[in-house]
Design a protein with these regions (language model features):
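N-terminal metal-binding scaffold of metallo-dependent hydrolase/deaminase domains
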Residues: 20-77, 89-90
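His/Asp/Glu-enriched, well-ordered alpha-helical/loop segment
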Residues: 279-283, 328-415
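C-terminal cap of metal-dependent C-N hydrolases
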Residues: 43-45, 400-455
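Alpha-helical scaffold segments that flank or form the walls of functional sites
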Residues: 108-176, 199-213
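Active-site gating loops and adjacent loop-to-helix segments of metal-dependent hydrolytic enzymes
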Residues: 106-136, 179-197, 255-284, 309, ...
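N-terminal amphipathic/hydrophobic targeting modules at extreme N-termini
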Residues: 2-4, 9-12
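Metal-coordinating catalytic core of metallo-dependent amide/deamination hydrolases
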Residues: 164-292
Length: 460
C-alpha cells in the first residue's frame, strides 16, 4: 500500500503478484534427477519405476505436459521457457499421507499410555480446544505449513467434532489437495465432544455442500471408531453415504487388542470389528480404514472385494505399542495400501521417516520392503488408496503438478552414505531410512513453490 492506502501499480508487491499470476499459467521446466512410478513394483518389478538421471519435468497451468530425459526434451522447448535447474537433487511426486489428525499436533510425543488411555488422557482434551474457532485457525495454518515442510502434498485428515474445525482447515488449505472430515462421536467420549444422530446428518450434509468438490478439496464421513458411535449414528452415516456416494469415508479399525475386545462387547452380533462397518454398508471404494492390525482373512477378503483401502501407520503402531501390520496379507487380497503418519499417535509428519518405521515393522514380520515399494506406497500407491490416481501420484501427462525436490546430501551422514552407494536402489534405500524434513528442498503444489528450504540451491 502507498501512504494514502492505495496499491501502487508500479510498486514491488503489485509487480510480484502480477508476475506470480502470469507464471502460474506459463510453461515452466524443472531439471534434476527425476523418478516416479507408473505401477506397483511388487507386481511389475523394475519396470514400475521411471528414472531419468538427467531429467526434465515440464509444467503448464499447474499440469504435467512432459517428463523425460533432458537431452530429448530441451530442444523441444520454446526459446523463452524458464528452466529451473535443481541438479544434482531429485524431483519426485509429492508425498501422500493417507491418515492424520490435525487437532492432535499439540499432543504428538505425549508419554506413556496405549490407545484407549491415550485418547482419554491426551486426545480428547486437545480436541476440546477446537471449540474456539480462532484456535482451530491457528492450528490449521501450522498444520498445513508442517505438511509442506515435510514434502506432503496430499493428505486425508481428521478434524475435530466441531464443524468449524473443517472450515478452518479448508480455508487454510490453499490449492492443496485434501480430504477432510468432521469427527463423529455420540457415546463413550466427553459430553462436550459428543453429537447426535440428527446433528451427524445435518452437520455433515452442510459441510459436504460447502466443501466437497471445492478447489481441490473432498469431504470424508468420519466416525472416529465403532466404540464412539451408536447404532443411530452409524445409520446416519450410512444414509449420508447413500445420498452422497462420491464422498469418502475414513475411520479406524482393529488398531489395538483391547479396542477389538471392546467392540466385541458393544456389538455382540458382529462377526468381527470390520463386520460392524460392513453391517452399515460402509465398506466401499472411497472408504479408507486406518491400522487394520487384527484382521482375519475373511475381513481382508471383504476389504478387497469392496475396493476399500488401508492406511498403514507404522510410527503410530510402534509408539502406542499397538502391533505390527501385515502388508503381504493385504497385498494377497488385492487391497490398496497407503502410508500414513497418524499424527499425533505417530511421532513425525515426515513420510520418509514413516517409511523407515514401516521397513522396521515389516522386518519384524519377516517381510521385505525395498525402497521402490516404499516410495510407491508414498506416492502412486497412496493416490490409488485415496482413489485420486487419475489426478495425482506420478508425472503422467495431464496430471496435477504436485512434486517435491529432495536433497540426498542434506546432512553429513546421508552425504557420506550416498558417496558410497553404487546404484539407484542403494541411494533410494538410504534416503528412505535416513531421510526426513531436512532433505526436502522444495514443495510444489500445482507447479507453484509453496515451500522452499532456506539456502536451497536453484539455478534458473
Amino acid at each position: 500500500k502507498t501512504r494514502r492506502g492505495y496499491l501502487s501499480a508500479t510498486g514491488p508487491r503489485f509487480l510480484f503478484e502480477k508476475y506470480k499470476r502470469k507464471t502460474q499459467y506459463m510453461k515452466q521446466a524443472y531439471r534434476a534427477e527425476i523418478l516416479d512410478f507408473i505401477n506397483d513394483p511388487v507386481l511389475y518389478g523394475l519396470d514400475a519405476m521411471r528414472h531419468f538421471s538427467d531429467g526434465l519435468l515440464v509444467i503448464e497451468a499447474g499440469k504435467v505436459v512432459a517428463v523425460g530425459d533432458a537431452a530429448t526434451l530441451l530442444p523441444l522447448l520454446e526459446v523463452n521457457t524458464p528452466i529451473h535447474d535443481y541438479r544434482p537433487q531429485i524431483i519426485m511426486p509429492g508425498l501422500i499421507d493417507t491418515h492424520i489428525h490435525y487437532p492432535q499436533c499439540e499432543v504428538i510425543a505425549s508419554y506413556g499410555t496405549q490407545l484407549l488411555d491415550w485418547l482419554n488422557t491426551y486426545t480428547f482434551p486437545a480436541e476440546g480446544k477446537f471449540s474456539d474457532f480462532k484456535y482451530a485457525q491457528s492450528v490449521a495454518k501450522f498444520f498445513i505449513d508442517e505438511l509442506h515442510r515435510n514434502g506432503t502434498t496430499t493428505a486425508m485428515v481428521f478434524a475435530s467434532v466441531h464443524p468449524h474445525s473443517v472450515d478452518a482447515l479448508c480455508e487454510a488449505a490453499g490449492d492443496m489437495r485434501l480430504i477432510v472430515g468432521k469427527v463423529l462421536m455420540d457415546r463413550n467420549a466427553p459430553h462436550s465432544l459428543c453429537d447426535s444422530a440428527a446433528s451427524t446428518y445435518d452437520d455433515n450434509k452442510t459441510l459436504i455442500k460447502r466443501w466437497h468438490g471445492q478447489k481441490r478439496l473432498s469431504y470424508a464421513l468420519t466416525p472416529r471408531f465403532a466404540p464412539t458411535s451408536t447404532d443411530a449414528q452409524l445409520q446416519a452415516v450410512q444414509a449420508l453415504h447413500h445420498e452422497f456416494p462420491d464422498v469418502h469415508l475414513q475411520t479406524h479399525v482393529a488398531e489395538n487388542k483391547e479396542e477389538v475386545a471392546w467392540v466385541a462387547e458393544l456389538f455382540p452380533w458382529s462377526r468381527s470389528y470390520l463386520d460392524v462397518y460392513d453391517h452399515y454398508d460402509l465398506l466401499f471404494e472411497r472408504a479408507l480404514f486406518a491400522h487394520c492390525l487384527y484382521l482375519n482373512d475373511t475381513d481382508r477378503a471383504r476389504l478387497g472385494e469392496s475396493g476399500a483401502a488401508i492406511a498403514f501407520c507404522p510410527s503410530s503402531n510402534l509408539f502406542l505399542g499397538s502391533g505390527l501390520f501385515d502388508l503381504q496379507a493385504a497385498q494377497k487380497h488385492n487391497i490398496q495400501v497407503g502410508i500414513a503418519s497418524d499424527v499425533g499417535g505417530g511421532t513425525s509428519f515426515s513420510i520418509l521417516q514413516n517409511l523407515s518405521d514401516a521397513y522396521k515393522v515389516l522386518q519384524l514380520k519377516q517381510q521385505a520392503m525395498p525402497a521402490r515399494q516404499g516410495l510407491y506406497l508414498a506416492t502412486l500407491g497412496g493416490a490409488r488408496a485415496l482413489k485420486l490416481d487419475t489426478q495425482i501420484g506420478n508425472f503422467e501427462v495431464g496430471k496435477e503438478a504436485d512434486f517435491i525436490v529432495i536433497d540426498p546430501d542434506a546432512t553429513p551422514l546421508t552425504a557420506q552414505r550416498m558417496a558410497h552407494a553404487t546404484n539407484i536402489d542403494e541411494r533410494l534405500f538410504a534416503l528412505m531410512m535416513l531421510g526426513d524434513d531436512r532433505h526436502i528442498s522444495a514443495t510444489y503444489i500445482l507447479g507453484e513453490a509453496i515451500y522452499t528450504k532456506p539456502f536451497c540451491t536453484l539455478q534458473t
